[in-house]
Amino acid sequence: MLTPIIEKNFFFNKQNIPWNEVEIYLKQYIGQSFIVDAYQDEIFIASDFPDEYSESKYTKKLRGAVAKAKANAAQIIDMMIKNAVNRRWVENKALKHKENASEGWYRYDTYFAIAVKGSNEDQVRLNRYRATLVVRKTPKGLFLYDVVDIKKEASTPLES
């Protein structure tokens, strides 16, 4: 599995992520679907995804590098789905999701990296992250709902 690398930081301010811009960026994915290579699951991007991704309780709690990582991961949603692993089913327990997740939820692990550049714009290292894709399961299919539990892993210096 190749880890998708975010080469360009669209959202680089760690203090005030412009989540409204992230939401607008994510709207380009609406109506598309992507295949999880490990399971051949087809995951669709519905119109509720951009808002949930940028306005969820999880997102609102994010600060610093993890907030920046989630904002920039919007650029590689397709690759994060493609490379997802460790699928597991979770029963829907929230009444508010009774209809839009009527058959429960799938959670998948995924990984991505952000290139960190030096002062002369050379890539210095990769900051690696793991995350969980939250996917609604309905009779109509699987729909990406959010990306949560983003955790930074050990950075990888580039070899000279």
What is each residue range found by the language model?
Residues 1-160:
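Ribonuclease/tRNase effector modules and their secretory precursors
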